[in-house]
Curated annotation (Swiss-Prot):
This is NAD(P)H-quinone oxidoreductase subunit H, chloroplastic. Coiled coil: none annotated. It catalyses: a plastoquinone + NADH + (n+1) H(+)(in) = a plastoquinol + NAD(+) + n H(+)(out); a plastoquinone + NADPH + (n+1) H(+)(in) = a plastoquinol + NADP(+) + n H(+)(out). GO terms for cellular component: chloroplast thylakoid membrane. NDH is composed of at least 16 different subunits, 5 of which are encoded in the nucleus. It is a peripheral membrane protein. One of its GO terms (biological process) is photosynthesis, light reaction. NDH shuttles electrons from NAD(P)H:plastoquinone, via FMN and iron-sulfur (Fe-S) centers, to quinones in the photosynthetic chain and possibly in a chloroplast respiratory chain. The immediate electron acceptor for the enzyme in this species is believed to be plastoquinone. Couples the redox reaction to proton translocation, and thus conserves the redox energy in a proton gradient. It is found in: Plastid, Chloroplast thylakoid membrane. Belongs to the complex I 49 kDa subunit family. PROSITE patterns: COMPLEX1_49K.
Amino acid sequence: MNVPTTRKDLMIVNMGPQHPSMHGVLRLIVTLDGEDVIDCEPILGYLHRGMEKIAENRTIIQYLPYVTRWDYLATMFTEAITVNGPEQLGNIQVPKRASYIRVIMLELSRIASHLLWLGPFMADIGAQTPFFYIFRERELIYDLFEAATGMRMMHNFFRIGGVSADLPYGWIDKCFDFCNYFLTRVIEYQKLITRNPIFLERVEGVGIIGREEVINWGLSGPMLRASGIQWDLRKVDNYECYEEFDWEVQWQKEGDSLARYLVRIGEMMESIKIIQQALEGIPGGPYENLEIRSFDREKEPEWNDFEYRFIGKKSSPTFELPKQELYVRVEAPKGELGIFLIGDQNGFPWRWKIRPPGFINLQILPQLVKRMKLADIMTILGSIDIIMGEIDR
């Protein structure tokens, strides 16, 4: 009697670049043995727009609207890094009020980014209800952004030496109201999700990254802090005025998808604490360093004072980058967002190298999904939190 032999043919499956769970135009070539993942190869570049080369052909002022298209869900951070580099190169002082406004906007943007991570992440693993809840709170944040900047997304709010406009009348009270309301909503999320047995079954022990591994791969943000390393650039670098606020770095030691979820939930609570302290202590004074608004008079015809007072539109300020090089970074919602900037005494940067956190965090995905089930790919990919705009640039 012949014993039937089982077939061991491997199946190759393309996930994306249009798959609804791909969080953008990411393509995964997955090799499967039944339900088990044998190999996974990410294919990037579908959203490449040449952002670094564009930067080298624009002044900083002209380039600011472009940077909001990197991570289009946390645009305040891309704006912050774009102005922080020239400010440090040119030794430009930012007024205290402008720094407080920046911190408030950055932390609101962090909450909005984490909310739009939480909803699709829960939808990926089968829970649809939180997906609708998070939009309720996110719209309130966008209402605040719209009142302060004029735009719900792509704000174009940061400027070299400050911000583009002061906070409007009544905005601080509205922001206080949102903070008090949002704390109750986060508690609701925790009741709904954190102890849910089906949720725990899907995320606990899935996609574990060890402490040594996370350092060797160069991961950052919640990916790093979920593996037991208390590293947050807001504490380490003390940029803007974060050292003036009382808050704690959120971290876990398990290193799995559940730990990454808990870190982000904790970060939203800490962001509210920072915002409340900034709103209470925001000083008076100017919202931008007016000395930076310099014009290259030699290239323009002579203007008299009368015309300057009544002219509708002035020419763009020309800021020459000193002949130096600098690496500057901020703690974005997804990790360490940095730029390596080289100036050569010109209005255009000589080199503008972007360090996107999502691109580096994504590199560990093939290792995490090997020997896991096909359904776990969505859980692990969702817990990494990627945006293809900043990965492909």
